[in-house]
């Protein structure tokens, strides 16, 4: 159970994130979903960084905050803990290739994980926890940023397992892991409904 609201980047600039536990930025570079040129606004960057740093949870799918600027492809790469290699830093070794096992988000996931078309050439920053990787391409990662957390996933086509992964990721980045099983089905093919007013 979650209350969902769609925010514009103007809403975010006006402080709308303050009323939320989790924000999702998902999509391919240059699309309205990812944000495109909106990420060329330092005020937007600062608002989102501040919100996460103070305890907000940020989820990125595909190419979140993608706008080539200041030597980074993901403007919020420091928050997500990942960035996309475009050839500018090929001479720099990326050593964070070790997969963390037993993470809360993947606790009941079964292989293979489905990223759809996914993303290639995503690499993790040194302190990022890599949850799934193939070769040198990071497909899933989490990162602490101040009091907040961020989660990155290379793609998120709809299926039962990805629904559960997203649900668990929302709880994780919001620091609400203990509330996960308040209304929860052990079988990922089932859903539970709760009507507190009835």
Question: PLM features: residue spans?
Answer:
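Catalytic beta-strand/loop cores that center a nucleophilic Ser/Cys/Thr
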Residues: 85-146, 154-165, 175-198
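A glycine-rich, often tryptophan-bearing local segment used as a flexible ligand/cofactor-contacting loop or short
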Residues: 30, 35-110
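Short, well-ordered alpha-helix to beta-strand connector turns
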Residues: 19-22, 55, 127-128
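Alpha-helical scaffolding within the catalytic cores
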Residues: 7-13, 43-46, 135-139
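Structural motif
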Residues: 21-31, 59, 150-152
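Aromatic-Pro/Gly-enriched surface loop or interdomain linker
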Residues: 1-22, 185-194
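Short catalytic/ligand-binding loop motif for oxyanion handling, primarily in non-cytosolic enzymes
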Residues: 15, 32-33, 66-72, 139, ...
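General small-molecule cofactor/ligand-binding pocket signal
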Residues: 3-7, 131, 151
């Amino acid at each position: 159970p979650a209350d969902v609201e769609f925010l514009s980047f103007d809403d975010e600039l006006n402080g709308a994130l303050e009323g939320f536990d989790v924000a999702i930025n998902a999509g391919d570079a240059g699309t309205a979903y990812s944000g495109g040129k909106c990420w060329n606004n330092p005020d937007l960057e600062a608002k989102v960084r501040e919100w996460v740093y103070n305890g907000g949870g940020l989820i990125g799918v595909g190419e979140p905050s993608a706008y080539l600027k200041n030597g980074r492809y993901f403007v919020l790469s420091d928050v997500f803990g990942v960035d996309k290699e475009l050839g500018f830093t090929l001479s720099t070794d990326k050593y964070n290739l070790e997969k963390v096992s037993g993470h809360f988000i993947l606790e009941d996931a079964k292989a293979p994980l489905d990223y759809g078309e996914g993303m290639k050439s995503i690499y993790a920053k040194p302190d990022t926890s890599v949850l799934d990787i193939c070769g040198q391409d990071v497909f899933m990662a989490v990162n602490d940023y101040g009091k907040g957390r961020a989660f990155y996933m290379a793609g998120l086509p709809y299926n039962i397992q990805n629904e559960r992964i997203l649900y668990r990721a929302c709880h994780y980045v919001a620091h609400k892991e203990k509330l996960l099983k308040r209304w929860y089905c052990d079988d990922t093919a089932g859903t539970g409904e709760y009507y507190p007013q009835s």
